Amino acid sequence: MNTVGGDIEAGLALAELLSGMRKPTVSLVLGGGHSIGVPLAVSAKKSFIVPSATMTVHPVRMNGLVLGVPQTLSYFDKMQERIVRFVADNSSMKSERFRELMTATGELVMDVGTVLDGEAAVKEGLIDSLGGLSDALDCLYGMITKEKR
């Protein structure tokens, strides 16, 4: 995958679809797995990332008309919790650590969040392994072979 992110609802729907599959699934982050790309990347049974790829973890954002009422903040909090819970359930990263990275200040200019390169994503437990296309395909074929037994 290589994505800058996008619609939260659509991204979470796809991530839930992938994580719920009984068939072998493998993800590979090439370039970037930013924003809602993070849940998509961890939704596979096994995830890989190339060393030069990056992943941006940040709080929920919205553009357009936003009503300045308590219900809006509550909605954002619930949406953010859905993402945190999904990532924690589908990776080795604890929810507390994901929240820390999501709300970190000082790394992104005029923004909140964290950018992880391939090594950092694996070290943090967000992604399973460093590797490229051959590694991802070998893993997938291995899963298929194991399932056939």
Region locations from a protein language model:
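N-terminal organellar transit peptides
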Residues: 1-38, 42-149
